[in-house]
Amino acid sequence: ISDFDEYEPLNDADNNEVLDF
């Protein structure tokens, strides 16, 4: 997840697609 810290994971539902959890 550290690699995705820039995207502020779990901050927005839209980020779900970017993080690909």
UniProtKB/Swiss-Prot annotation:
State the protein's name.
Testis ecdysiotropin peptide 1
Where is the region Disordered? 1-21
Relate the protein's function as given in its record. Start or boost ecdysteroid synthesis in testis of larvae and pupae.
Task: Please tell me the species this chain comes from.
Answer: Lymantria dispar (Gypsy moth)
Highest taxon of the source? Eukaryota
